[in-house]
Amino acid sequence: MFMGEYQHAIDPKGRLFMPARLRESLGEAFVATKGLDGCLFVYPKEEWKRLEEKLKALPFTRADARAFQRFFFSGAGECEVDKQGRILVPAHLREHAALEKDVVIIGAGARVEIWSRERWSKYNEKAAPSYEEVAEKLIDFDL
């Protein structure tokens, strides 16, 4: 399970330090893709395989299922950690998440998310007021 929030900077070549605590569970190679809300989703290979199977099972006759599969899989790529603990974030993913300098890496349960600091701040400002309301709605899931 991934948790925590880490502040880092991405360099002009797209290299980003991945915190050791997260690397331990991600492994040496993992999958990054376009995430929702303007961030990147990062999955360990085992979790990616489970998700891939679920998404492949969606009915291809539904336009929304096809659209989501295209978006999700077309942005995906394998990332590896270098000797300095950095990953190279591909240009198309940096563009999707507006990663230019200051970056926030968060643990989000089964995945890691990578955000531009600006987007993360805006997301938190927007989401924080509804946190308790959402928690009340999720009570039905026996949390």
UniProtKB/Swiss-Prot annotation:
Name the PANTHER family on file: TRANSCRIPTIONAL REGULATOR MRAZ (PTHR34701:SF1)
Domain SpoVT-AbrB, residue spans? 5-47, 76-119
Q: State if Cytoplasm is listed as a keyword.
A: yes
Q: Could you read off the lineage of the organism from its UniProt record?
A: Bacteria, Bacillati, Bacillota, Clostridia, Eubacteriales
Q: Which GO terms describe its molecular function?
A: DNA-binding transcription factor activity; transcription cis-regulatory region binding
Q: Name one GO cellular component term.
A: cytoplasm
Which InterPro entries does the UniProt record give?
A: MraZ (IPR003444), MraZ_C (IPR035644), MraZ_dom (IPR020603), MraZ_N (IPR035642), MraZ_sf (IPR038619), SpoVT-AbrB_dom (IPR007159), SpoVT-AbrB_sf (IPR037914)
What subcellular compartments does it reside in?
Answer: Cytoplasm, Nucleoid
UniProt name for this protein: Transcriptional regulator MraZ
Protein family (similarity comment): Belongs to the MraZ family.
Superkingdom of the source?
Bacteria
BP-aspect Gene Ontology terms: negative regulation of DNA-templated transcription initiation
